[in-house]
Amino acid sequence: MPVRRYGGRYNNSSSGVSNALSSSSTAGLRPSPSSRENSTPLSTHHDPAFLSTNHAKNEGGLCQKHHVRFREPSVEVEVEIMDDEPSRGLQKPPSRARHAADANNNSASAQCNTTRTSDYTFYTNEDQKKVYEALRSLRPLPELQEPRRVKEYSEVSIKESLYRIVEAHDVIMVAGAFFGDEGKGKTVDAVAHHPLCTCIARVNSGENAGHTVYDKAGRKFVFNLAPSGLLLPGKRNYIGPECVMDPVSFMEKEIIQLISAGIDYHDRLFIGNVCIVTPYHKLLDLLGSAANSSTLKGMAPVHGSKVMKRGIRLDHIFNDDETLRKRLEKDMETYLGLLKVKNLSDADVVRLCREENSDGVLRVPDYVIAFAQAKEKVKFLMNLYHDRVRNNPDFPARCDVIYELRAAVLRGEKVLLEGPQSYWLSNARTKFWESTTSADTTAAGLLAASQLNFQQFKSVVLNVHKAPGSSRVGIGACPSSFVPQDFFSAQNIKTLHDLPPATCANFEAIQRTLFRDGFPYSNDKAKHNGIMAPVEYSDETGDYNIGVAMAIASAQHHGECGAVTKKPRVCGFFDCVLQHEVNSIQGPYLTISALDRGDEYDKVGVTIAYVYYNPEGKQVNVNGHVYKNGDIIRAGDPVPSESALYHCHPIVKLIDGWRDNPIAAAKRRRNTPLPRGLCELLSTIEYFTNCKVLSIGNGPNGDDIIYLRQ
C-alpha cells in the first residue's frame, strides 16, 4: 500500500481523547508495520492496482464485515472494514506496542484476508523512515538555487492591470489551476464589476461545484450552479445547456436564498436547455460506489445518460407529457437494473438513504427518498417536475443561452465564463482521469461549452491557484500534499468536528517544526536536497508525523474545508510541476489567492520537481516512458499519469517568509513595497512555470487583492 509522510498516535491517557476516539469502526484500517511488508512507504496515495492485490490484517482478529463509504467532496471511496461492532466515528490510533503485538495475530487475520483497507498511521512508521533513508542522499538539484535574481514587484491599480486585460478581450474565462477550491470567486467578482462585462455564465458541470458570495449588505449566499454575478444589479447571468441541473434542488437550495433575501432575479438569471439530474441519478451515485461517484449529486450517472442520449433536458419538462414519460421510463432502466443485480428492494434503498443522513447532514434530500419509496416512479417524477418546475412561478426564465452570449459579444459587451472545479479535475485530462469530475473543466472545455467562435472572438484565461496551503479533495495522486488524499476518510474523519478540539491546534509550533526539523539542511545549499524528513510533532493529544500534523493544522487554521460539508481538504506545497502544464495549455496569467497566509510562516515551500521511488523497485510505463527509481520529473517535463505519481515525492525549494513585513490587508497600507520573501516566492513560481502573476489575494474581502505591474 503506498504510504508517505503521515502518522501519529493519540496518547491513551489524554483527557477526553480516548472517549472521542473510542469507536472500533476503523479497527482494520491501521495494521502493524510488520504486516505491511508489501506496502510502498512515502508514496502519496492509494494505488488502485495495489488495493486489488493486497490484503490488510485485522488488529483484533475479528471477522465480522461491514461497509463504510467515505466520500470526499469530489469523489467517493468505499472501504470494507472488518470489525466486531459496526459503528460510526473515530478509532483511537493504536500505540506502537499494540502494533508490535498485532504482528503475532496472523492466524486470525488470515481468515479475513479479503478486506480492502488503508494502512495509514498517525505516527511515523518504520517503512517511512526506510524510504527517507533511501532518498536523503539524493544529490541536490541545481534548480534549488534558482532563480538567481529576485524580481521586484510593485502594486498597481485594478484599472492598470486586470481591466486592461478585460478591455482587450471579448471573452474572459476564470479557471481553476489546481484541483478546485482555489478562491476563484474573488477574481470572478473583480471581472464582473467591470462596466463592459454584462454577462456572467456557468456553461458546464453541475451541483457538485460550489462557491460562497456576499452582497453589499454582507449577506452570505452559497451557490452551486448559480453564477456569482447574480447579486450584481444590471448583470445578466446564464446557466448554459451543457450544465447538468437538478431543478428541484436548485430551487430548494439556491433560488430560495434569493427569495428569502428579497432579491428579484427574474430579469438577471436565465437558464438554457440543461440536462436534468433526476432522483434516480443521485441514487445510482449512492448505490454504485464507483471511484468517481462523488457527492451524491448524480454527476457521473447523469453525464452517462447525456452521452448515451437518454435522459431528459429542461425543455422536455415544458412540453409533451407522453415524450417525457417515455424518456424517463427508458433512462430509468439503468437504475432498476442495478437494483435487480444488487438484489435490493425499494425498502433497502430507503434504508441506505436514511443511513447516509443519520449523522444530521442531509446528503440525500427528502424528495429523493420519496422517489425511492414510490410505487409508480415515473408518475412521481412527472408530478414532481410539474409542481416544482413547469407550474412554479418562481422558476427562472428560460432562453437560448448560446444565442444570447454570442449576441452580447457582437454588441461589444464582455462575457465572463465562470469555471467550475479546475484544470486537473477535468475529465478531459488523462493524467488524473480516474479521479476527476465528469465534465471538461479546463479553459478549453469552458470555451467549447459556450460555443463562442474562438476564431472570431478574442478570449483570455485568468488562472487561479492558492498558496500557501494549496489543496485537493477526493482520492487520487497529488505528490505535493502533506498526506494521502484519502487520509482523512480512511480515519473516518468526515468533518473537522470529528477531531478532538486540541488535536494539532498549535499551527505556529507545527509549521516551525516542519521547516526547522523536516528540512534539517535548509540553510546548507550543499546538503539541502528538498526531501522532507519524517520527523514527529507532539502535543497533549499524542505524537504525529509532521505531514499529518501539517495536514490537520492547515485544514483547521486556514479553514480548508467544504463550505457546507465541512469535510477537510488536504493541503500541501505549491506545485510548479503541475502548474507548468496548466500554464503551457491555458496560460500565462495567474492569480494566487490567500497569500496573506504566508504572514504566519517561517518559510514557504514550493515543489520544483518530483523524484520517483518505489521501495519494491517496480517500474511504471507511461506513454512509452519507463519511470524507475531515482528518476527526476522537473517542471516542464511531461507529467506522468497517476500510476507513476503515486510513487512520486516532492523536491521542495524553501523560501524565507515575511513575518516582519505582513501583506494582509488589515496590516498593510496600499502601495507600500512588497517584502523580499514574497517577491522571491513570486519570482520562483514565474521562473519554474513561465506564468505571469497578475495579482495576489491578501484578505477575506472582495477587494483584498494586490495587482502587480506586468
Curated annotation (Swiss-Prot):
Substrate binds at residues 563-569. It comes from the Eukaryota. The active site is at residues 181, 211. The keyword GTP-binding applies. InterPro entries: Adenylosuccin_syn_GTP-bd (IPR018220), Adenylosuccinate_synth_dom1 (IPR042109), Adenylosuccinate_synth_dom2 (IPR042110), Adenylosuccinate_synth_dom3 (IPR042111), Adenylosuccinate_synthetase (IPR001114), P-loop_NTPase (IPR027417). Parasitic protozoa lack the de novo purine biosynthesis pathway and rely exclusively on the salvage pathway for their purine nucleotide requirements. One of its GO terms (biological process) is 'de novo' AMP biosynthetic process. Gene3D superfamilies: Adenylosuccinate Synthetase, subunit A, domain 1 (3.40.440.10), Adenylosuccinate Synthetase, subunit A, domain 2 (1.10.300.10), Adenylosuccinate Synthetase, subunit A, domain 3 (3.90.170.10). Residues 32-43 have a biased composition (Polar residues). GO terms for molecular function: adenylosuccinate synthase activity; GTP binding; magnesium ion binding. GO terms for cellular component: cytoplasm. Belongs to the adenylosuccinate synthetase family. It is found in: Cytoplasm. Residues 11-25 have a biased composition (Low complexity). IMP binds at residues 181-184, 208-211, 295, 309, 421, 437, 567. This is Adenylosuccinate synthetase. GTP binds at residues 180-186, 210-212, 569, 697-699. Its EC number is 6.3.4.4. Binds 1 Mg(2+) ion per subunit. Mg(2+) binds at residues 181, 210. Plays an important role in the salvage pathway for purine nucleotide biosynthesis. Catalyzes the first committed step in the biosynthesis of AMP from IMP. Pfam families: Adenylsucc_synt. Residues 1-57, 82-112 are annotated as: Disordered. It catalyses: IMP + L-aspartate + GTP = N(6)-(1,2-dicarboxyethyl)-AMP + GDP + phosphate + 2 H(+).
